[in-house]
């Protein structure tokens, strides 16, 4: 019987549903149980692996070499490890069984739901027809009653007046006919509904319901079959008696049974086999009794009155020991013949045939035999001694015992001889003179005791210990000496040349010697020949060397002190002190052979030497006393040296420059170079002079000189350097060409004679190392000069006709009146900004509006020469106003950066205020200022013409209108105060125009619309938004009083910002996360492109993420990266325009062409992807979504990386907004577990991409959910190799899937490997 015939009732149907629910619950219970068993098996496998690893940890395994036990144990542990791996494999298979059970449960739920729906459907059809029959029957009864009533009325009227025809009769007749017609129709419908119900009920009972039940029975039986197979797999993987376990156990039994006790030590014996030991020969030394008179004989006991008692006692002890040994032997023999079971070695079994630890009978017999032999040996040894003593005593017999002592004379003589020999031996032991003297000196203490601790006791307390000792013997000249930080204060050790005398201290009066001593170890010396005595003092490493000078050292002659300024320049710029020795050597040469002209001028300073006697023998009990005394001497000598130094030079003497040091050139040759040279000559002279003094004075004076120059610009402007004639402005092209040589000449040369003389002096007097130091000093001077000139607004200097070309210039003294100058400049600039938008009276054109950069700056930046009559210049007024005076050319001021900037020269002119007050047009023409602004895309001169009140273009064509640009992009574009742009936003499904300004932050102002349709902020309304923006821009009035934001610089659209009207959408070719993807065409170039659109309903956060892909792609250019053409943000919808790759998605391409792909093509795809990812890695870009679905293929099978929606331009990215929409099966474990993304995470994804390519589009981790795949990956599971995959490529996949991110290869290595494999494959074919 089946479901079709037995379960047609309603109760049976409900019971079938309940049974299916119970089966589903049972499946859930089974799944949980199998999961728990798999978990337990995994834990057991881990524990068993730990047991095997612990068993294999054998200390000194080489000592067990050749041991069968050790070999068997290792095999046993290896089999345990195999058993653990088998348990782990079975546990993993049980997890797969759980997955199958889960899928079966899901399919069963779907089948249950389908059965319920189908049963309800056919039952509802029958119920509907049943209800229809009932309804038709009630209608039939109703119409029948109406028919009967009207028929009665009609008959009554017709019978009463059959010949009359009237209106009333006609009405009755019509109603009667209608009732009759309704009755007949209802009758027919009722009959049809009954017939249909009969057929439906018959089919429901005989066909539909039995068929449904039969199908349900078939489905359930198929589920039961699958269920049984799943249970069989679970039982199979949980069977401990399986063949694999039996094989493991069999191998364990085999290796244990192979242990043969007789062969255990065979190899060990062969390895350490030696020949039998030779017997030791014990003989009496005859030399012991040669010099002893008496009766002592070798190997013979002496029996006399002195030893007889001891021999008898010894005999008794030995006889007792012999008896004890004999008794023990008797007892042992009795036990062997018949005793206790334990003694006999019988085995006590514990219910089995295996021993519980008691030795076998054979082992017991061996042990007893060994003990018996030992007792017999002891007995024999003691018996030998007994026989020897008895023999000696028997020889004496009953005779009188001989005397053991000689007469008194002999005894006394022996004592004397012994005493003499002992004394002689003692004298010989102390005959070594060197050792005795050293011991005596060490005992008494003194110089050697101090010398032993010289490295510790004779160091200055305030100086650190040297890290490594320096070699005292130096080869070559003094420039090979290395600087050290150890010093001995200001002392130098000298000796008197007349004869030996104690070492004395002398103050170092030479300044350079003092510097050398302060930075070198005292052990460094300069090697000199014996014929030429050294002129430099020898610097000792420790004071111990001072106390122990040799007797043959030459006297030391101190060099004469040199002026302080001759050495300081190099000292300030170099920590190496080789120049000190160089200067000393050169001074020595100068002193020894001076020129005739200089002999009369040279004044030899007096040498003042303080010679202080120091005892050569230090106190024996105090070394600190010596150190305290040395510190005291150092302090005295330091004070004396300070008093002997020359007074410092006057700092104020450098305040003014000499007349012949400052020269100006003619403007026709190089006005810019002349300007910079004249403006910086004073400070440059001071800097070069300043380097010739001490460091402290240098710093103080440089600060003072800078503050002098900063102090008063007003007095500075009154100098002759400013009051010069005016010339016309040279064209910008000539200024740009003269800028480069001017700057080069300014940085390389110098007009200061002091600096030149200093350089020549350094070149003549210093060695190679010192020359580099001098150059460094010169570079420092240049840096100081450039820093000073950067902060000063200088004026243009020309060669006047009424003044001489040689100027007398003096730096003004410190004053604080520069605020008025700044206020004057500010007022001029404000007037210029307010008046510059007025049209010219002659040509009706407007004056030039200066954006962030002038044409002069753009010409320099792009190295383009501006033609004389350019189109851009025709847009502005070039008419010279009447009575215009010559304008001073601008000054190039070198700043901290490489790019120069311009500054107006009219601010400091005496006549500039008067010119502005009298004539507005002259002010406009003379104030062609260029303001320093950001290098971003501010309005260029071509755009400046459009920023006017006469524009008729629509708003979306304005360069400063950015369309529906998100606020985050606005924040990125607006960087400086005054930057502004206009954009559109959608709020509450209503479009609004917003003005965004950077002013103490980023502020956004919604353009208000009046009732008349005009636009305004807080000021007057305007007819168009352009006019409103122009008014705010030219008037420089705040947008709102509260914000105070002023419009200064419009920010243009970037070059990749396209208009939506430039793109024509053709057909939809796909769908992305943010919207549809279309094939489109550009109107301008007729180029086919791909366009990604963003749905208008998405929030701003999603739109920002959508535009992020465009921002990343716009800066990349690589053949394996999809190229960005532009972004359309002028209006909705936002679009990203990219190149169209005709091959489409790589995943679709792999699945469609799975049969035609070759291994060479697949490896080429892998190489293309590696090349693109290598490029991204070099740009610090993390893709985060690398997969076959996000790669494109062109017609030449070349792969391009696409879909940068999740990309980040960082070396390391930490996810902070959750792990939603993360492709789990393509993501590295560290990113899933910790949210940490690096380029090595893309390497993991690249391995999955390779697997997709070689599997020809299969889904990774097929049959596993995301969570299940993640668990398997964490446990070490890796996907198997796809079919026909080269072994090297799969090995590369496994390297990309390394659990440790640092162990994965980088994309550069991956590309090289894949490229090498392709090359090898090509060569093989």
UniProtKB/Swiss-Prot annotation:
Protein name: Tyrosine-protein kinase Fer
Keyword Ion transport appears in the UniProt entry: no
Entry annotation: catalytic residues: 1185 (proton acceptor)
Top EC class of this enzyme: transferase
Ranges of biased composition (kind: Low complexity): 676-685, 749-780
UniProt feature, compositional bias: Acidic residues: 907-927
UniProt KW keywords: ATP-binding, Cell junction, Coiled coil, Developmental protein, Kinase, Membrane, Nucleotide-binding, Phosphoprotein, SH2 domain, Transferase, Tyrosine-protein kinase
Localization terms from the record: Membrane; Cell junction, Adherens junction
Function: Tyrosine-protein kinase which is required during embryogenesis for formation of the actin cable in leading edge cells of the dorsal epidermis and for the timely progression of dorsal closure. May play a role in regulation of adherens junctions and cell adhesion through phosphorylation of the beta-catenin arm.
Family membership noted in the UniProt record: Belongs to the protein kinase superfamily. Tyr protein kinase family. Fes/fps subfamily.
Chief site of localization: membrane
Gene this chain is encoded by: FER
Region of interest (Disordered), residue spans: 453-506, 586-605, 659-700, 735-780, 875-928
Domain F-BAR: 1-264
GO molecular function (one): phospholipid binding
Compositional bias (Basic residues): 453-462
SMART domains the UniProt entry points to: FCH (SM00055), SH2 (SM00252), TyrKc (SM00219)
Swiss-Prot/TrEMBL GO biological process terms: actin filament bundle assembly; axon guidance; dorsal closure; dorsal closure, amnioserosa morphology change; dorsal closure, elongation of leading edge cells
Distribution of this protein across tissues and organs: Expressed in a subset of cells in the embryonic central nervous system (CNS). In the embryo, expressed in leading edge cells of the dorsal epidermis (at protein level). Expressed in many tissues during embryonic development, some expression is transient and absent from most of nervous system. In the embryo, strong expression in the leading edge cells from late stage 13 and throughout dorsal closure to the end of stage 15. In the embryonic CNS, expressed in the midline glia from stage 13, and by stage 16 expressed in a segmentally repeated subset of cells and in the dMP2 neurons.
Protein kinase domain boundaries: 1063-1318
Organism taxonomic ancestry: Eukaryota, Metazoa, Ecdysozoa, Arthropoda, Hexapoda
Organism the protein comes from: Drosophila melanogaster
């Amino acid at each position: 019987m089946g479901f079709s015939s037995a379960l047609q009732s309603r109760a049976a149907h409900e019971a079938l549903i309940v049974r299916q629910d119970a089966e589903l619950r049972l499946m859930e219970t089974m799944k949980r149980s199998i999961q728990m068993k798999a978990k337990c098996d995994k834990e057991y496998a881990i524990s068993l692996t730990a047991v095997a690893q612990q068993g294999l940890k054998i200390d000194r395994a080489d000592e067990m070499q050749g041991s069968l036990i050790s070999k068997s144990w290792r095999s046993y542990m290896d089999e345990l490890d195999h058993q653990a791996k088998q348990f782990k494999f079975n546990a993993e298979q049980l997890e797969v069984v759980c997955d199958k059970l889960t899928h079966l449960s899901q399919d069963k739920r779907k089948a249950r739901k389908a059965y319920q729906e189908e049963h309800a459907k056919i039952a509802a059809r029958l119920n509907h027809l049943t209800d229809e029959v009932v309804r038709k029957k009630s209608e039939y009864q109703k119409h029948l009653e109406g028919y009967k009533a009207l028929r009665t009325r009609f008959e009554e009227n017709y019978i009463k007046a059959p010949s009359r025809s009237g209106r009333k009769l006609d009405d009755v007749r019509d109603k009667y006919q209608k009732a009759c017609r309704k009755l007949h129709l209802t009758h027919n419908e009722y009959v049809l509904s009954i017939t249909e119900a009969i057929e439906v009920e018959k089919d429901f009972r005989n066909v539909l319901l039995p068929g449904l039940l039969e199908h349900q029975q078939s489905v359930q039986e198929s589920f039961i079959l699958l269920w049984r197979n799943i249970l069989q797999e679970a039982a199979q993987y949980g069977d401990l008696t399986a063949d694999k376990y039996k094989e493991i156990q069999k191998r364990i039994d085999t290796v244990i049974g192979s242990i043969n006790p007789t062969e255990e030590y065979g190899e060990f014996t062969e390895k350490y086999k030696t020949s039998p030991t030779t017997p030791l020969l014990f003989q009496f030394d005859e030399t012991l009794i040669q010099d002893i008179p008496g009766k002592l004989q070798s190997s013979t006991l002496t029996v006399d009155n002195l030893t007889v008692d001891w021999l008898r006692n010894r005999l008794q002890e030995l006889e007792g020991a012999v008896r004890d040994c004999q008794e023990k032997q008797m007892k042992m023999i009795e036990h062997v013949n018949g005793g206790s079971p334990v003694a006999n070695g019988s085995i006590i079994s514990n219910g089995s045939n295996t021993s519980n630890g008691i030795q076998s009978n054979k082992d017991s017999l061996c042990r007893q035999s060994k003990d018996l032999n030992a007792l017999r040996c002891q007995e024999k040894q003691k018996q030998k001694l007994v026989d020897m003593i008895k023999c000696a005593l028997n020889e004496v017999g009953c005779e009188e015992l001989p005397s053991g002592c000689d007469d008194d004379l002999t005894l006394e003589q022996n004592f004397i001889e012994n005493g003499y020999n002992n004394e002689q031996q003692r004298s010989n032991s102390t005959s070594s003179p060197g050792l005795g003297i050293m011991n005596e000196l060490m005992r008494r203490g003194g110089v050697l005791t101090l010398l032993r601790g010289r490295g510790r006791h004779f160091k200055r307390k305030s100086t650190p210990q040297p890290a490594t000792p320096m070699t005292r013997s130096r080869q070559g000249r003094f420039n090979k000496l290395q600087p050290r930080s150890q010093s001995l204060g200001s002392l130098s050790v000298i000796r008197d040349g007349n004869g030996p005398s104690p070492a004395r201290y002398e103050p170092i009066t030479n300044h350079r010697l003092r510097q050398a001593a302060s930075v070198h170890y005292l052990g460094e010396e300069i090697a000199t020949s014996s014929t030429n005595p050294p002129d430099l003092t020898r610097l000792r490493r420790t004071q111990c060397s001072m106390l122990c000078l040799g007797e043959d050292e030459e006297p030391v002659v101190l060099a004469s002190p040199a002026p302080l300024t001759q050495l300081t320049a190099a000292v300030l710029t170099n920590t190496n002190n080789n120049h000190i020795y160089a200067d000393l050597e050169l001074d020595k040469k100068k002193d020894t052979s001076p020129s005739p002209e200089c002999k009369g001028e040279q004044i030899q300073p007096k040498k003042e030497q303080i010679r202080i006697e120091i005892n050569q023998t230090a106190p024996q009990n105090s070394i600190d006393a010596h150190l305290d005394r040395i510190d005291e001497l150092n302090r005295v000598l330091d004070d004396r040296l300070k008093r002997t130094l020359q007074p410092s030079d006057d700092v104020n003497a450098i305040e003014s420059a000499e007349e012949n040091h400052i020269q100006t050139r003619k403007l026709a040759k190089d006005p810019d170079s002349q300007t910079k040279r004249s403006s910086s000559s004073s400070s440059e002279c001071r800097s070069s002079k300043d380097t010739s003094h001490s460091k402290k004075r240098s710093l103080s004076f440089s600060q003072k000189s800078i503050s002098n120059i900063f102090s008063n610009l007003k007095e500075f402007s009154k100098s002759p350097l400013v009051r010069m004639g005016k010339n016309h402005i040279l064209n910008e092209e000539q200024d740009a060409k003269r800028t480069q040589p001017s700057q080069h000449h300014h940085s390389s040369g110098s007009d200061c004679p002091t600096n030149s003389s200093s350089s020549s002096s350094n070149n003549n007097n210093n060695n190679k190392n010192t020359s580099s130091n001098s150059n460094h000093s010169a570079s420092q001077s240049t840096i100081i000069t450039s820093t000073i000139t950067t902060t000063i607004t200088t004026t243009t200097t020309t060669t006047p006709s009424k003044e001489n070309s040689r100027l007398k210039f003096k730096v003004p003294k410190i004053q604080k009146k520069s605020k008025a100058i700044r206020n004057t400049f500010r007022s001029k600039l404000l007037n210029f900004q307010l008046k510059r938008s007025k049209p010219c009276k002659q040509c009706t054109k407007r004056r030039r509006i200066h954006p962030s950069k002038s044409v002069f700056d753009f010409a320099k930046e792009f190295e383009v020469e501006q033609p004389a009559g350019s189109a851009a210049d025709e847009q502005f007024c070039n008419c010279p106003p009447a009575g215009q005076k010559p304008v001073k050319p601008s000054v190039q001021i070198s700043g901290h950066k490489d790019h120069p900037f311009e500054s107006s020269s009219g601010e400091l002119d005496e006549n500039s205020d008067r010119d502005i007050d009298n004539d507005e047009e002259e002010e406009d023409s003379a104030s062609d200022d260029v303001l320093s602004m950001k290098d971003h895309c501010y309005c260029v001169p071509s755009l400046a013409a459009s920023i006017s009140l006469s524009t008729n273009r629509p708003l979306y064509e304005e360069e400063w209108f950015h369309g529906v640009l998100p606020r985050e992009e606005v924040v990125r574009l607006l960087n400086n105060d005054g930057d502004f742009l206009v954009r559109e936003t959608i709020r509450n499904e209503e479009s609004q125009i917003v003005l965004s300004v950077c002013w103490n932050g980023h502020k956004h102002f919604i353009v208000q619309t009046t009732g008349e349709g005009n636009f305004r902020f807080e000021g007057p309304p305007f007819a168009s938004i352009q006019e409103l923006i122009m008014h705010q821009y030219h008037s420089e009035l705040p947008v709102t009083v509260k914000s105070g934001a002023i419009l200064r610089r419009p920010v243009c659209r970037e070059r990749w910002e396209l208009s939506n009207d430039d793109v024509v959408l053709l057909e939809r070719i796909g769908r992305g996360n943010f919207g549809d993807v279309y094939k489109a065409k550009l109107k301008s170039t007729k180029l086919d492109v791909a366009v990604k659109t963003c749905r208008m309903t998405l929030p701003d956060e999603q739109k920002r993420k959508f535009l992020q892909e465009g921002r990343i792609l716009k800066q990349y250019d690589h053949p394996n990266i999809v190229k960005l053409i532009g972004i359309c943000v002028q209006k909705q919808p936002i679009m990203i325009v990219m190149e169209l790759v005709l091959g489409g998605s790589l995943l679709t391409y792999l699945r469609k062409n799975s049969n035609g792909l070759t291994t060479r093509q697949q490896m080429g795809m892998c190489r293309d992807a590696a090349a693109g990812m290598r490029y991204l890695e070099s740009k610090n870009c993390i893709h985060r979504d690398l997969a076959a679905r996000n790669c494109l293929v062109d017609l030449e099978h070349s792969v391009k990386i696409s879909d940068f929606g999740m990309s980040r331009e960082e070396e390391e990215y930490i996810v902070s907004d959750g792990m939603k929409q993360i492709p789990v099966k393509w993501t590295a474990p560290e990113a899933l577990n910790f949210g940490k993304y690096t380029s090595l995470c893309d390497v993991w994804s690249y391995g999955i991409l390779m697997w997709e390519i070689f599997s020809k589009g299969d889904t990774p981790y097929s049959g596993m959910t995301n969570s299940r795949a993640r668990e398997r990956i964490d446990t070490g599971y890796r996907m198997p190799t796809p079919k026909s995959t080269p072994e090297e490529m799969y090995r590369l996949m496994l390297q990309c899937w390394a659990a440790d991110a640092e162990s994965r290869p980088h994309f550069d290595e991956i590309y090289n490997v894949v490229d090498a494999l392709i090359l090898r494959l090509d060569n093989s074919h």
